[in-house]
Amino acid sequence: MARGCLCCLKYMMFLFNLIFWLCGCGLLGVGIWLSVSQGNFATFSPSFPSLSAANLVIVIGTVVMVTGFLGCLGAIKENKCLLLSFFIILLIILLTELILLILFFVYMDKVNENAKQDLKDGLLLYNSENNVGLKNAWNIIQAEMHCCGVTDYTDWYPVLGENTVPDRCCMENSQDCGHNSTSLVWKTGCYEKVKMWFDDNKHVLGTIGMCILIIQILGMAFSMTLFQQIHRTGKKYDA
């Protein structure tokens, strides 16, 4: 009976990690596609030029793919080394997430101020020929979220000139609508709009976070169960 349950657990873990691996492959593909596209998803931060959406998706996809592969191979081959590696990687990811979450809440005010200042510094690169992606990214977020600048529309004045904002800041977009006109532009800054979006979707994001946490804990539990069984028997059990 116990042997049958462990065999069932073995293949459940394999199937779960196979899906996990396929998701990682999908994320990696999306990240590569974004990196070779027109640069619409470039980084907003000049301090972290590599911190773009494409690079983040590539890194996450790679980690998910490698972790899923270790889980699949460790389960189907009943390999203690691979199962232990799978467990350690999940543990490191879990601890990293918890540490980053704690640090974020402890230093929230400082993080907000530094992020705002860094984004404002990034606005200075808006018209740079080597940063077309950043320009496209700002145009997209301002048009989609109905916002202008980082804290408000005046953030653009040092960049584009007095009383001048990008045309995508206009409530009704038209050619040169952002020149010498501030009455018909979005007044709310994009930083505040993004915070509002997170606040409006906190329940959904919280649910997703809890699902990820449960998946990680289950993966660790399954891998250790198989590891301990193989260690106790000193040999593989037949499927």
Curated annotation (Swiss-Prot):
Database matches in InterPro entries: Tetraspanin/Peripherin, Tetraspanin_animals, Tetraspanin_CS, Tetraspanin_EC2_sf
Membrane topology: Multi-pass membrane protein
Name of the featured protein: Tetraspanin-9
Cytoplasmic side: 1-13, 77-85, 225-239
A cellular component annotation (GO) from this entry: plasma membrane
CDD domains the record matches: NET-5_like_LEL
Database matches in PANTHER family: TETRASPANIN, TETRASPANIN-9
Family according to the record: Belongs to the tetraspanin (TM4SF) family.
PROSITE patterns per the UniProt record, alphabetical: TM4_1
Natural source organism: Xenopus laevis (African clawed frog)
Side Extracellular, residues: 35-55, 107-203
Subcellular location: Membrane
Segments crossing the lipid bilayer: 14-34, 56-76, 86-106, 204-224
